[in-house]
């Protein structure tokens, strides 16, 4: 039907007859001549129809935006003064000799033009029009290239692409499952997988020592700004390996991805940072190292001060007091400071103390803060020295339980970095390693795994794990790019007794363990090899590589923030006949006034 994509028509095609198919992007009438910009996924091509061919010219006059056409013509150089170097095909044009309207279009709700600002709901309702925009075509094409890079690299490393079930058993993995009722087993349900975690471990026990899959996963999570109920991850598992093998594999993969897609050369070895250091310096387990701001502990300097907010946190074993210096921050207004104070309350902080350093040489007289009256001059000077302030700086303080300080001041660090344009350009990748095996749930005070219950501790002793669970480190690792967690993984437990110990510590008794994970515990008894793996978020990685602001921009048909699809109106009610066949009766909806 066509001989060329639009962008393939160039000066090598001069004087040749070509045929292209696509959409009418633009139509212009100039001096009795009709100019068309024809668009396909590769780009734009200018076609000229002259009035001498009355029959074809009459068809061209009928064309409107988004008509679908088939165009045949002769390629020629554009006249001097008509060259457009902003277009890939801007040095040539096609003199149309044939024209066929393949389909018509009414005036669309918006034109697929990158220069328009389009309401997001409208974009998703008419996603098939939105995806015609050049920027969207480029993003999804880059995503395809990303997947191709991944497959080529792993295939060369002797990995096998093996599919795992989509209809599986509900297992606790940190979020709610999407349940699928079984018609042939009334009252029973499948679960859509939150990840292929257990199946890929079973593949290692089956002798497939190198597995990968680019796979859809499903999580019925609470609504958050940039989460999708269904998402895509690169899932990897290997047997007879250690942590170093996984890290080197992923470093090699990312090196190829960045080179082939962005022409950026990454170092052979990425920096590594222990989890404890990341939380101490940045208040985050996914620090953006492009941001120069850091948290500085000052608890030892304020233990005996008269400011109870500082003193109580400093003398609490689970408390923390930190300072965060903002260079040249004295220009912040009272309203700005109040807004930042309100911001940290979102993360559980009760407020935000600060000191403005208007004139460092003037001593206490050169400082401005509501808390100065509670602090001795010695304590203040010690803080200023440790934080290494200069005239014009402002210091923010966080004092509370350590988890509140980390979350609130880590978020403030990120916000200040963006608000004050402190984020350096470029790419900062790092591994966060040496994670705690468990954390205490602040509500229930029960142990819960930091990653998942199949992660191996660094010390492979059930007795040691029971004696000091909160001090035990895991063989776990996350890859972070520019402040985004792109992936995480671990070495897995391959000894049945150690796995039972972990289940017991997190409150899964023997009966529940066998009901939910009996198949895994059985498999572990039959010669399970040491194994481990990782999963990378394809959506988020594609978002970063395309410089997008949302993962929805790199997903062809995303859900909205309310987990709905304006295009198809999903989710939607099921018919009574279908519900009856499935043995489901809906409970009445209870509304509260």
From Swiss-Prot:
It is found in: Cytoplasm. One of its GO terms (molecular function) is nucleic acid binding. It comes from the Bacteria. Its EC number is 6.1.1.23. Its main location: cytoplasm. One of its GO terms (cellular component) is cytoplasm. GO terms for biological process: aspartyl-tRNA aminoacylation. It catalyses: tRNA(Asx) + L-aspartate + ATP = L-aspartyl-tRNA(Asx) + AMP + diphosphate. It is an enzyme of class 6 (ligase). Pfam families: GAD, tRNA-synt_2, tRNA_anti-codon. ATP binds at residues 219-221, 228, 485, 537-540. Keywords: Aminoacyl-tRNA synthetase, ATP-binding, Cytoplasm, Ligase, Nucleotide-binding, Protein biosynthesis. Gene3D superfamilies: Bira Bifunctional Protein, Domain 2, GAD-like domain, Nucleic acid-binding proteins. The keyword Transmembrane helix does not apply. Residues 197-200 are annotated as: Aspartate. The record marks 30, 81 as: Important for tRNA non-discrimination. L-aspartate binds at residues 173, 219, 451, 492. PROSITE patterns: AA_TRNA_LIGASE_II (PS50862). Aspartyl-tRNA synthetase with relaxed tRNA specificity since it is able to aspartylate not only its cognate tRNA(Asp) but also tRNA(Asn). Reaction proceeds in two steps: L-aspartate is first activated by ATP to form Asp-AMP and then transferred to the acceptor end of tRNA(Asp/Asn). Homodimer. Belongs to the class-II aminoacyl-tRNA synthetase family. Type 1 subfamily. This is Aspartate--tRNA(Asp/Asn) ligase.
């Amino acid at each position: 039907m066509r001989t060329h994509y639009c962008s393939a028509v160039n000066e090598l095609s001069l004087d040749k007859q070509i045929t292209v198919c696509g959409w009418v992007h633009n139509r212009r009438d100039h001096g009795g001549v009709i100019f068309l910009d024809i668009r396909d996924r590769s780009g734009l091509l200018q076609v000229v129809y002259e009035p001498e061919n009355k029959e074809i010219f009459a068809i061209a006059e009928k064309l409107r935006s988004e008509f679908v056409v088939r165009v045949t013509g002769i390629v020629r150089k554009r006249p001097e003064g008509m060259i457009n170097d902003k277009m890939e095909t801007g040095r040539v044009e096609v003199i149309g000799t044939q024209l066929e309207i393949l389909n018509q279009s009414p005036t669309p709700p918006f034109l697929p033009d990158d220069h328009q600002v389009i309401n997001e709901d409208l974009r998703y309702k008419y996603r098939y029009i939105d995806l015609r925009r050049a920027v969207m075509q480029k993003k999804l094409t880059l995503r395809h290239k990303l997947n191709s890079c991944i497959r080529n690299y792993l295939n060369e490393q002797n990995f096998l692409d093996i599919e795992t079930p989509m209809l599986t058993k509900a297992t606790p993995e940190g979020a709610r499952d999407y349940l699928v009722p079984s018609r042939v087993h009334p009252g029973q349900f499948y679960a859509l997988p939150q990840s292929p975690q257990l199946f890929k471990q079973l593949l290692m026990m089956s002798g497939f020592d190198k597995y990968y899959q680019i796979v859809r996963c499903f999580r019925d999570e609470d609504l958050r700004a940039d989460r999708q109920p269904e998402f895509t991850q690169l899932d990897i598992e290997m047997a007879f390996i250690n942590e170093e093998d996984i890290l080197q594999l992923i470093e090699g993969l990312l090196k190829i991805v960045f080179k082939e897609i962005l022409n950026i050369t990454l170092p052979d070895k990425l920096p590594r940072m222990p989890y404890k250091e990341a939380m101490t310096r940045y208040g985050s387990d996914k620090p953006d190292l492009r941001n120069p701001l850091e948290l500085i502990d000052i608890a030892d300097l304020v233990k005996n001060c008269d400011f109870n907010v500082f003193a109580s946190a400093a003398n609490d074993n689970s408390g923390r007091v930190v300072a965060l210096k903002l260079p040249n921050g004295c220009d912040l207004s009272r309203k700005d400071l109040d807004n930042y104070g309100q911001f940290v309350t979102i993360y559980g902080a009760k407020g935000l103390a600060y000191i403005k350093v208007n004139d460092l040489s003037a001593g206490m007289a050169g400082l401005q803060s509501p808390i100065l009256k509670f602090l001795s001059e010695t304590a203040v000077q010690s803080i200023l020295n440790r934080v290494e302030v200069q005239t014009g700086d402002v210091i923010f303080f966080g004092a509370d339980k350590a988890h509140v300080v980390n979350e609130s001041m880590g978020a403030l660090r990120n916000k200040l970095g963006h608000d004050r344009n402190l984020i350096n350009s470029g790419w900062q990748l790092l591994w966060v390693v040496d994670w705690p095996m468990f954390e205490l749930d602040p509500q229930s005070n029960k142990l819960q795994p930091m990653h998942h219950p199949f992660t191996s501790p660094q010390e492979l002793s059930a007795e040691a794990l029971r004696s000091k669970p909160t001090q035990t480190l895991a063989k776990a690792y996350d890859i972070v790019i520019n402040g985004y967690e792109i992936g995480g993984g671990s070495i897995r437990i391959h000894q049945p007794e150690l796995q039972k110990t972990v289940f017991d510590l997190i409150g899964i008794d023997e009966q529940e363990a066998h009901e939910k994970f009996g198949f895994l515990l059985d498999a572990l008894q039959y010669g399970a090899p040491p194994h481990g793996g990782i999963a990378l978020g394809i959506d988020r990685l594609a978002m970063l590589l395309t410089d997008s602001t949302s993962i929805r921009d790199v997903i062809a048909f995303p859900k909205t923030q309310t987990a709905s699809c304006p295009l198809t109106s999903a989710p939607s009610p099921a018919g009574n006949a279908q519900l009856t066949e499935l043995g489901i009766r809906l409970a009445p909806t209870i509304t509260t006034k």
